[in-house]
Amino acid sequence: MQFGAFSPILRSHSTKIAGLTKEPWVFSNEVSDILRGIIRQRYNMVPYIYTMAREAYETGLSLCRPMYYDYPETQEAYDYRNQYMFGNDVMVAPATSPMKDGYTEVKVWLPEGQWYEFASGKTLQGGQVLTRYFALDEYPIYIKAGAVLPMYNDKVMNLNGKDETIV
């Protein structure tokens, strides 16, 4: 679900078994709450996503793109194939390892410059590879320093302006 939240179309991506149900409401309350949080984060980011989608339309450069599109001269941009840019200012380093003791390990390459780790709010110096640990309800995404991300707040329930809870 985390990958789906940071891609052009939100959908769950969780298994190679086609018949396995992946809807948020089929999981335990704890996991369902985490999935709702991921979906809310996606809704909060809709202004940014729309802005970057419009730019993709105008430039032909994909909303989701491999790191080497933005950093073609840097070897790590080719080595860290799971990482990608989500628009111009958000870098996603998906958690793909199994969890141990409630956390998953993610090796992250940060390009030159400063980056903000969304989950912790920490400022991290780029130009290095870091090993980070994330709980199930944390997202391994990084924001370029100086970026302005247009976002909704948590009170937005849907994009039609009605006050109906959707998640």
Predicted regions and their residues:
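Catalytic-domain carbohydrate-binding cleft regions of carbohydrate-active enzymes
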Residues: M1-A147, Y152, N160
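Short, intrinsically disordered, charge-balanced linker/junction segments flanking boundaries
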Residues: N160-V167
